[in-house]
Amino acid sequence: MDAWPRCLERLEAEFPPEDVHTWLKPLQAEDRGDSIVLYAPNAFIVEQVRERYLPRIRELLAYFAGNGEVALAVGSRPRAPEPLPAPQAVASAPAAAPIVPFAGNLDSHYTFANFVEGRSNQLGLAAAIQAAQKPGDRAHNPLLLYGSTGLGKTHLMFAAGNALRQANPAAKVMYLRSEQFFSAMIRALQDKAMDQFKRQFQQIDALLIDDIQFFAGKDRTQEEFFHTFNALFDGRQQIILTCDRYPREVEGLEPRLKSRLAWGLSVAIDPPDFETRAAIVLAKARERGAEIPDDVAFLIAKKMRSNVRDLEGALNTLVARANFTGRSITVEFAQETLRDLLRAQQQAIGIPNIQKTVADYYGLQMKDLLSKRRTRSLARPRQVAMALAKELTEHSLPEIGDAFAGRDHTTVLHACRQIRTLMEADGKLREDWEKLIRKLSE
């Protein structure tokens, strides 16, 4: 099928080459009409693809093929694929079939119990727990979790949905990616079934929608979601949404929809700090039954700074190679196995990128940021940039000083300590820091 090569090409641009070669290139795609089956040579690859890549594959295939229903199987693609027979009930009474299915759309693996809490996500975790315990409460309805990709927003959303179902097994909890909402609406329009589409959403107890930034520019989709939102909100049904940025920053979203999204609670999920990253690596290793020494977890946490998905990718690559080779996981083995991945991560966030991002954020010229002038409007952003360089790169203090117009390493050390101290009392500076971390991690 044509869509799979295009999907694979996009995945190659988003994930490390070694991961693509190990987990994605072996897959064979079969289009069965109502779904797409991806065949893997063994169950281990199926497990890795399901855990790490399946949500993104579904998004891309929905975009390229108009079909985000994807199944994984062990084996090889049949030479003469036959479409799956339609269930008799659907064939005889198509109008009775739900436009958007309820069953199986929540991943039960994601719970609050296996979510690793840290300073960067503790407010989001607390809000998701409250939404699950008191669904529909105006204090957190809607609950909007926003932040860069791979930080755990979907995990918290799934965990809240699973907790709702555990408390009330009869609860109708619907999880959708934004593209699925769009596709279901288009299908309802084509089938002249908009009344059924609207009625189905009115019958649920909680609606969870991922990546609402993709509603931008789709006027009819926003119109229908606006009315769906109002009906659920008025009925005190819980709404949980995720977005890759604060909704007011999303161009193409209607002002009235942005206003609705601000009614409840909006929480930023930030990149995890070092301690949280290390805890995540160790927790994910335990889930896989893998023995990971602390110093290896610290190595991965120190080098992989951007998001949880990258941490998991590094861990999975490490465990897979250890299984294939029979070697023990040591620091030396980790450095050897993850060499290209770590190099790419290091190159992604360099001092010039940090300087430009900070200068743009504070509305400064680069020459002013690097100048010898010490006015407060320049000194504070300069200190922030130095502290970010120390936090996000492997450069030494003298190297960072050289990059800032030849400043002494003691100046850099003072800047790092000053920013760390000020952030404890200055909420605005803490907010600036977290926003810059998010921008540099995108």
From Swiss-Prot:
Start and end residues of each stretch annotated as Domain I, interacts with DnaA modulators: 1-75
SUPFAM superfamilies in UniProt: P-loop containing nucleoside triphosphate hydrolases, TrpR-like
Record function comment: Plays an essential role in the initiation and regulation of chromosomal replication. ATP-DnaA binds to the origin of replication (oriC) to initiate formation of the DNA replication initiation complex once per cell cycle. Binds the DnaA box (a 9 base pair repeat at the origin) and separates the double-stranded (ds)DNA. Forms a right-handed helical filament on oriC DNA; dsDNA binds to the exterior of the filament while single-stranded (ss)DNA is stabiized in the filament's interior.
Entries under PANTHER family matching the protein: CHROMOSOMAL REPLICATION INITIATOR PROTEIN DNAA
Alphabetized Gene3D superfamilies for the sequence: 1.10.1750.10, 1.10.8.60, 3.30.300.180, P-loop containing nucleotide triphosphate hydrolases
GO molecular function, a single term: DNA replication origin binding
Keyword Cell wall biogenesis/degradation belongs to the record: no
Organism per entry: Xanthomonas campestris pv. campestris (strain ATCC 33913 / DSM 3586 / NCPPB 528 / LMG 568 / P 25)
Positions of region (Domain IV, binds dsDNA): 323-442
This protein's name: Chromosomal replication initiator protein DnaA
GO biological process annotation, one example: DNA replication initiation
Keywords recorded for this protein, A-Z: ATP-binding, Cytoplasm, DNA replication, DNA-binding, Lipid-binding, Nucleotide-binding
Family that this chain belongs to: Belongs to the DnaA family.
Statement: the UniProt record of this protein carries the keyword DNA-binding: yes
Main location: cytoplasm
